Design a protein with these regions (language model features):
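Generic structural signal for small/hydrophobic residues in well-ordered secondary structure
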Residues: 13-16, 23, 44, 58-62, ...
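Short, strongly hydrophobic transmembrane alpha-helices
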Residues: 15-45
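Membrane-proximal extracellular/periplasmic loop immediately following the first transmembrane helix
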Residues: 37-108, 221-225
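Extracytoplasmic
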Residues: 55, 114-116, 124, 148-151, ...
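Short amphipathic beta-strand/extended segments in non-transmembrane regions
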Residues: 61-62, 78-141, 256-262
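Coil residues (strongly favoring Ser/Thr
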Residues: 74-75, 147, 253
């Protein structure tokens, strides 16, 4: 019986070859597209290097600010300032770690009278390297002491290091970021752009620049985002509750403004 089914199928395939090939190619293309979508969603949602802690991470990608006593509808949406990030999120005691991360920006990475490349750079702090797990090919991440002191040091991706030096073994050497000298503390394997909260090609301490002074609206608004690492997902409610308490305390210290997060921290960056 099964043999008869195969014979009938082959007969119909030979009888209409054009329809057969269209059907086969259409089915293959549909399966391929579904596989691509599934893999893309997996890469963006499940724990994978360097975002190995997605399942216990919370994010604040933006916030809102309004005049004190005003309605939520009469507000502006923006990134947070370094000051807001420090007082409202870096002060969390229920979290394992909190990092502030700027949006990626284009930067000129160069050697004096040598090679140069344009790369995506983010400004962050030492906690970034605790929350995200990178594979270091040379050197190491900048430390808390480097971050606190504003030391001009940088971590490069492998692609940038190779473009400049021809190798990834460059820890301790110096590069220029927009013509400002930075010491290379380490080199990491390249990161996919799908790792939206960790992606960059150059990472530096935000304390080594003037980004903290780029703030307005009573210094509440700036260019930073926050990533919060919980000890477990069960701590999410406690973290959100403490974040709300810190928000109210912060608002009490402001003269004319109030900040609010529109449902954040949440689990999507």
């Amino acid at each position: 019986m099964i043999r008869l089914y195969f014979q009938q199928a082959l007969y119909h395939l030979r009888e209409n070859p054009i329809i057969t090939w269209v059907s086969v190619l259409g089915t293959a293309l549909a399966i391929c597209m579904i596989m691509v979508l599934v893999i893309t969603f997996q890469v963006r949602l499940v724990d994978c290097e360097p975002e190995v802690n997605r399942s216990r991470s919370l994010y604040v990608s933006a916030m809102s600010v309004k005049n004190k006593g005003g309605s939520d509808g009469d507000s502006s949406n923006a990134r947070m300032s370094v000051r807001t990030g420090r007082e409202c999120f870096k002060s969390l005691t229920t979290a394992e770690a909190v990092t502030l991360v700027s949006l990626p920006e284009k930067v000129r990475v160069s050697l004096p009278a040598g090679n140069k490349v344009t790369a995506d750079m983010v400004q962050t702090d030492d906690a970034f390297w605790h929350i995200f797990r990178f594979r270091f090919l040379s050197g190491k991440a900048f430390t808390k002491a480097d971050s606190d002191a504003g030391v001009p040091c940088a971590v490069l991706s492998a692609a940038v290091a190779r473009r400049l030096f021809g190798t990834t073994d460059v820890a301790g050497k110096t590069v220029q970021l927009n013509y400002v000298e930075y010491r290379i503390s380490g080199v990491v394997a390249d990161v996919s752009v799908l790792a939206t909260s960790a992606y960059a090609q150059v990472w530096i301490p935000y304390t080594s620049t003037d980004i903290a002074r780029l703030a307005w609206w009573e210094e509440t608004v700036g260019q930073m985002r926050a990533v919060i690492l919980a000890r477990s997902a069960a701590d999410f409610p406690a973290i959100r509750e403490e974040a709300e308490q810190l928000r109210r305390k912060y608002n009490d210290s402001l003269r004319d403004s109030e900040v609010f997060y529109r449902g954040q921290p949440d689990e999507q960056f």
